[in-house]
Amino acid sequence: MIASGGIADHSDIKQVIASGAIAAQIGTLFLSCDESGIAPCYKNALIQAKHDSTVLTRAFSGKLARGISNSFIKQLKQLEELKNIQPLPYPVQNALTQPLRKLAGSQNNTDYLSLWAGQSVHHCHKTSVSALLNRLTQPT
């Protein structure tokens, strides 16, 4: 078993290995690294995120996924609650929001960009992959 989700530091890795996992998979923390190719505004959103910044949403893709809450997610949630308008299923919703996401990315507009992030997003820092790997592999 490979453990994933919520892993942010060396102690988390030790804990999942002690629980029987053979490895730990980490995603979100690498997005904020200098070497990541995501939009600068996305990196900044990750670095500024708090522990309660993420929500589960179907707004951008039609599939349930966790991301940093923004204006688009909030507006779609209002439509769901007030008018019972649901996002379309994947891949239709994903295709429909693609031009919006592309434009938002080109304008560094995080209000209409999908900002996928896990529950450990509040542990994101401006760092290099090398420094992150050192932090993950060395006890504090």
Where are these regions (language model features)?
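Conserved active-site-proximal phosphate/metal-binding subdomains
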Residues: 2, 8-140
